[in-house]
């Protein structure tokens, strides 16, 4: 598939491991021409991580797909569709993943997508425990959750 000069890419998450490229293209082509659909594979297991990026020819097609598909069921799972890079107030979604720093927790920017790894989170601030749910800090640590305490 050819790539668009401007990329109109959206993140599609919550996918079943069995969801293949044909299912995605069949579903998303309804809203406009799909240039590319990139599935993210776990290096250790060789299985889908349950999300992919879909690139459209134009912005209107991408926006329509996001509006219509976000929260809909595909292959037995409710999926998430959002513009690539649209995160909460703290910043963008990191890399090819649902994680990454998204600002302070108390401002709604904390990412609960897990800690570390490819696309994993490291959000929050040190007062809140920082480094994501699956990483350093949090409950049971020294008061304040800082690595310095």
From Swiss-Prot:
Gene3D superfamilies reported in the protein's UniProt record: 3.30.70.330
Function: Possibly has a role in RNA transcription or processing during stress.
Native species: Arabidopsis thaliana
SMART domains: RRM (SM00360)
PROSITE patterns: RRM
This protein's UniProt keywords: RNA-binding
Residue ranges, compositional bias (Gly residues): 87-101, 110-123, 131-143
Thylakoid as UniProt keyword: no
Domain RRM: 8-83
Protein name: Probable glycine-rich RNA-binding protein 1
Residue segments, region Disordered: 80-149
Any single biological process term in GO: response to cold
Protein's UniProt keywords contain Repressor: no
Triggers of expression: Up-regulated by cold stress, dehydration and salt stress.
Molecular function (Gene Ontology), one example: mRNA binding
């Amino acid at each position: 598939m050819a790539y668009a000069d401007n990329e109109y890419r959206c993140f599609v998450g919550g996918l079943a491991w069995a969801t293949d490229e044909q299912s995605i293209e069949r579903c998303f082509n309804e809203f406009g021409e799909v240039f590319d659909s990139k599935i993210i594979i776990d290096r250790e297991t060789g299985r889908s991580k349950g999300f992919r990026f879909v690139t459209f020819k134009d912005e209107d097609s991408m926006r329509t797909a996001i509006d219509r598909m976000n929260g809909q069921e595909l292959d037995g799972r409710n999926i998430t569709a959002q513009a690539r890079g649209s995160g909460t107030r703290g910043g963008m979604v990191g890399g090819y993943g649902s994680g990454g720093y998204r600002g302070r927790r108390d401002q709604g920017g904390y990412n609960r997508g897990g800690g570390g790894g490819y696309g994993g989170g490291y959000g929050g601030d040190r007062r809140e425990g920082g480094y994501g749910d699956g990483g350093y800090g949090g409950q049971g640590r020294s008061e304040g959750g800082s690595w310095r305490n």
